[in-house]
Amino acid sequence: MSNMSVNVAGVEWKNPVTVASGTFGSGAEYSEFVDLNRLGAVTTKGVANKPWEGNPTPRVAEVYGGMLNAVGLQNPGIELFCKRDIPFLKQFDTRIVVNVCGHSLDEYLDVVKRLADEPIDMMEINISCPNVKEGGIAFGTDPKGVETITSEIKKYAKQPVIMKLSPNVTSI
């Protein structure tokens, strides 16, 4: 069999296949249908410093040629995530990439500091999601905001960090 391994930000993955954050929960929801051991990484749904209920329903609309969603980053919060989801993912032979979200720099830093000593492989900092009204989209569309949040997070993260940038700009 061919060697499919890749190096992502200094972390060796057995293959380049991961799931997009937000589409796969933290893996448990799909583990009966997808062998998580075959993935190079599981990128989790966004995790915030406290639980978020997300947007009111309906959150998904089918349209000609696809679908639109505005889930609003519903998540259990960092404490439950660390207690429940990380141990679940550790049973599999795959890398763990945690998507971090927040409404403010302080909220992002709360999550990053909490994850620093957890057995995860990388953090993906979500500064791209357009359905977060406070903070998230502002960081992702302003170069100074991106620079600030990235440099502050790097002060506390012990794992490699990747930034999930917004496509809602004229130039990246």
Predicted features and spans:
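Flavin-dependent oxidoreductase catalytic cores
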Residues: 1-172
